[in-house]
């Protein structure tokens, strides 16, 4: 009986929110388990399902759309997606009566081990991450002996957990209408265009936001979507009966610190699961006794934002609570410690907090992915706990074909979940609680052997293991206070009752990853040893020229002494040639060079082994940070260590929380004749494929974070900037080239392509034609030609002998970059950041929001007053 019905996409104009866009293209898969009488007319049921599905799509045409990645003109970021009115919604029908019996499922309480994802689900993959469209929604009706398994698959970009529940509610209503004859064939399309703008209800409203305000979230680089993977044979559903749930609430209430402290039913369930899983992981040898444990929980912000119902889109805020394992292990207070942490974080969620996070995600949308930071800890110290407990799916009436009209169970398929994912299912009609745990087998075994856990889950109503799941007791490591293990007391105490109040609803979200940081060592500044006098030629570079380009330096002849003349012909600017001798104070402040270290000796100096990092005072307020690449033996090639150390420097700026910190960043070379030679191929040749992929992930993450900095960034390029070295410069807002600079993306000559942003950042700067020329030929572009095509914003050249020219060009490029940073930093700190934000989006809405953010600043008032008084304003970033 296998067949498929397609409902063509009705016309719609839907503007999804940014909060919808950033979710990975994974589908929520809910398996609704119905019983059917043996005499059921399946053909009649199929007709009614088809009619109901058709009318559900007409009411919400978005369900028949397609999810597509952002196009190149929208920024082409892999973490952003749109929903377009193309394609259709599918209802697939299968008859599996010879393979599955409802009675067998009921005996195991609908165990996930009997529910084959590939067989039952219309979109079985964990996620659809390729650059192609994927359906928003598919339903699959699976007839089994004595029942029907209806699978609802809706992509997360279209609806969050409550949104999916609302869709199911609409379908239940339409199915009842079809059975009563209120709706029937022929099926008519929707006559009008469905229009909605979710951004009016869910947005940051121009709030810039700060990621530091949100413990569960990060924008640290990582290919989080790639870490979502299948986990099989480690998924199990448990039940807490009504009596056991009452006992559990009493156990938690006994830990209350007074009448002003109360816990919800959800707090009791969540704390119990959190504590039990972490102790089981400890017994399984996965988690050390001194570990900090974490749980992330999604909170539905519809009530906080006062959003009218139904609203289908994503309005989820994720909290992150932490408690040391040693505290969880305390039998008398562990449950209370967990619940107390959960309650505090849930109470801390407000409309303002949600908008702050969304505002940050909107502001940084094209440069970095705002995501959850718990993914990497999911198999060790963290879990994500999603509660559907108050979503009344069991109360929905799907019509008389199912007897009483109600589902007998709701299940989620095991495939597509990962260790650390916990789902609390909707409250069962008898008042009991079911929850699904996905863990490593060793953890599941330890859970089953935990007397305290079994006390609440192993009564007559609880779910027993199927025959293939029955396991022998696991040999447990000694539980002592030594070597990271902790002592766990499993003797239950005597408990008294206290009334428990209810909890806010909680919704599911998608899972992302995190990275760690290492602080570089700080050392004292190095004394100056020698000064040099430099003759300079400076060129302000205007718009890209349409004139013929200069002769090309091919990679085979890329020597540091082969450069084009400094003079540049452009259509809109003239070359200004200035040759001067710097004054003693200028040399002391900017160009005094240590022969050994090649430092600009101002401010504190940090020297990780591959970098030289220091600061100088910025005009008005704050400092200018200067980072010099310093691997002379490897021509500043990007090693694993250099990428890590540079990431730490960039994150240090991201973590600053005040305007008086870093005002601008200058990146230069401490090595004559080269800016950066690209990836360290000597190091690369000894890497495995996994190590190479990990390095590329780190490099791409570094470049995304550099490009996402809210302050001006300037690359000072002297000598060769090849491959990843040029891509590093492309991440900066501005580029200063010395006359000996040679830029190239030669990867095609190595049978690869640029892989760290070159293919999309370069055309945004020099245009598609020039980018194609550079990438397809792999040729080296000299400084003068680079200036003509707009690759650099300043072109400078040094006079002097051939022996000193490479050194002089490097120093001059750095000096010019610092002067440019000082010139920018003389303006208002808030205004500079707002301008960068507006330019990053290049749209009216963001510009308007950015302008609003500067209207009420003290700096604006100070600037207006200074203008009236004909003096220079003092702008401090307030």
UniProtKB/Swiss-Prot annotation:
PROSITE patterns: ENOYL_COA_HYDRATASE. Its EC number is 4.2.1.-. GO terms for cellular component: mitochondrion. Gene3D superfamilies: 2-enoyl-CoA Hydratase, Chain A, domain 1 (3.90.226.10), Chloramphenicol acetyltransferase-like domain (3.30.559.10), Lyase 2-enoyl-coa Hydratase, Chain A, domain 2 (1.10.12.10). It holds the Pfam family Transferase. Substrate binds at residues 677-681, 724. Keywords: Isomerase, Lyase. Pathway: Secondary metabolite biosynthesis. The record marks 747 as: Important for catalytic activity. GO terms for biological process: fatty acid beta-oxidation. It comes from the Eukaryota. Enoyl-CoA isomerase/hydratase; part of the cla gene cluster that produces clavatol and ortho-quinone methide. The clavatol biosynthesis cluster cla and the terrestric acid cluster tra are both involved in the production of peniphenones and penilactones. The non-reducing PKS claF is responsible for the formation of clavatol from successive condensations of 3 malonyl-CoA units, presumably with a simple acetyl-CoA starter unit, and 2 methylation steps. Belongs to the enoyl-CoA hydratase/isomerase family. This is Enoyl-CoA isomerase/hydratase claC. It comes from Penicillium crustosum (Blue mold fungus).
């Amino acid at each position: 009986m296998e067949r498929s019905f397609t409902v063509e996409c009705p016309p719609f104009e839907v503007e999804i929110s940014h909060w919808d866009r950033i979710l990975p293209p994974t589908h929520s898969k809910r398996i609704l388990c119905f019983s059917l009488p043996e005499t059921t007319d399946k053909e009649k049921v199929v007709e009614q399902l088809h009619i109901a599905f058709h009318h559900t799509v007409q009411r919400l045409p978005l369900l028949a759309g397609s999810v597509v990645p952002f196009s190149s003109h929208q920024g082409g970021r892999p973490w952003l997606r749109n929903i377009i009115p193309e394609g259709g919604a599918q209802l697939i029908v299968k008859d599996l009566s010879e393979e599955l019996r409802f009675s067998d499922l009921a005996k195991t309480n609908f165990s996930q081990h009997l529910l084959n994802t590939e067989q039952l689900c219309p979109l079985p993959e964990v996620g659809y991450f390729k650059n192609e469209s994927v359906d928003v929604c598919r339903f699959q009706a699976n007839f089994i002996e004595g029942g029907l398994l209806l699978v609802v698959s809706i992509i997360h970009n279209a609806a969050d957990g409550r949104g999916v529940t609302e869709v199911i509610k609409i379908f239940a209503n339409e199915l009842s209408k079809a059975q009563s004859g209120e709706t029937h064939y022929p099926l008519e399309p929707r006559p009008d265009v469905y229009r909605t703008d979710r951004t009016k209800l869910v947005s940051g409203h121009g709030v810039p936001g700060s990621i530091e305000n949100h413990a569960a979230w990060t924008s640290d680089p990582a290919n989080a979507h790639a870490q979502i993977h299948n986990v099989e044979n480690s998924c199990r559903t448990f039940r807490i009966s009504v009596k056991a749930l009452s006992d559990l609430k009493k156990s938690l209430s006994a830990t209350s610190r007074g009448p002003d402290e109360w816990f919800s039913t959800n707090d009791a369930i969540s704390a119990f699961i959190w504590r039990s899983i972490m102790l089981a992981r400890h017994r399984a040898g996965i988690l050390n006794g001194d570990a900090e444990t974490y749980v992330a929980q999604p909170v539905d912000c519809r009530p906080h934002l006062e959003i009218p119902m139904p609203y289908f889109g994503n309005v989820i805020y994720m909290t992150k609570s932490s408690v040391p394992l040693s505290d969880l292990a305390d039998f008398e207070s562990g449950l209370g410690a967990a619940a107390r942490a959960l309650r505090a974080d849930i109470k801390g969620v407000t409309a303002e907090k949600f908008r702050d996070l969304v505002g940050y995600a909107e502001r940084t949308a094209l440069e970095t992915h705002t995501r959850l930071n718990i993914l990497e800890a999911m198999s060790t110290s963290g879990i994500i706990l999603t509660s559907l407990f108050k979503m009344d799916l069991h109360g929905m009436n799907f019509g008389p074909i199912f007897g009483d009209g109600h589902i007998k169970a709701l299940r989620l398929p095991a495939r597509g979940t990962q260790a650390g994912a916990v789902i609390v299912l909707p409250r069962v009609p008898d008042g009991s609680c079911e929850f699904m745990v996905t863990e490593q087998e060793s953890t599941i075994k330890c859970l089953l052997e935990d007397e305290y856990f079994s006390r609440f889950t192993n009564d007559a109503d609880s779910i027993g293991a199927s025959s293939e799941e029955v396991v022998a007791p696991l040999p447990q490591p000694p539980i002592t206070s030594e070597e990271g293990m902790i002592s766990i007391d499993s003797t239950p105490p005597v408990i008294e009752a206290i009334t428990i109040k209810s909890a806010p609803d909680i919704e599911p979200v998608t899972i992302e990853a995190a990275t760690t940081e290492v602080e570089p060592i700080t050392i004292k500044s190095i004394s100056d040893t020698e000064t040099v006098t430099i003759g300079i030629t400076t060129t302000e570079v205007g718009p890209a020229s349409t004139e013929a380009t200069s002769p090309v330096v091919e990679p085979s002849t890329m020597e540091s002494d082969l450069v084009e003349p400094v003079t540049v012909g452009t259509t809109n600017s003239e070359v200004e040639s200035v040759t001067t001798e710097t004054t003693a104070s200028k040399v002391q402040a900017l160009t005094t060079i240590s022969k050994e270290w090649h430092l600009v000796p101002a401010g504190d100096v940090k020297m990780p082994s591959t970098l030289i990092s220091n600061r100088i005072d910025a005009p008005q307020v704050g400092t200018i940070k200067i980072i010099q690449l310093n691997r002379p033996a490897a021509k500043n090639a990007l090693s694993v260590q250099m990428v890590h150390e540079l990431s730490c420097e960039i994150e240090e700026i991201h973590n600053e929380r005040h305007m008086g910190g870093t005002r601008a960043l200058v990146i230069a070379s401490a090595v004559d004749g080269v800016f950066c030679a690209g990836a360290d191929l000597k190091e690369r040749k000894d890497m495995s494929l996994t190590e190479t992929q990990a390095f590329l992930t780190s490099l791409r993450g570094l470049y995304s974070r550099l490009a996402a900095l809210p302050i001006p960034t300037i690359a000072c390029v002297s000598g060769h900037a090849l491959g990843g070295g040029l891509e590093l410069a492309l991440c900066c807002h501005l580029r200063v080239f010395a006359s000996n600079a040679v830029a190239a993306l030669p990867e095609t000559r190595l049978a690869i392509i640029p892989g760290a942003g070159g293919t999309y950042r370069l055309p945004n700067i020099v245009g598609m034609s020039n980018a194609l020329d550079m990438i397809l030929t792999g040729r080296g572009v000299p400084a003068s030609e680079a200036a003509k095509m707009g690759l650099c914003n300043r072109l400078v050249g040094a006079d002097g002998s051939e022996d000193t020219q490479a050194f002089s060009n490097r120093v001059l490029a750095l000096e010019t970059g610092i002067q440019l940073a000082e010139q920018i930093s003389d303006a208002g700190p808030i205004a500079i950041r707002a301008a960068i934000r507006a330019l990053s989006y290049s749209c009216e809405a963001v510009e308007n929001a950015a302008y609003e953010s500067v209207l009420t600043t003290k700096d604006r008032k100070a600037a207006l007053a200074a203008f009236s008084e004909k003096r220079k304003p003092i702008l401090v970033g307030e």
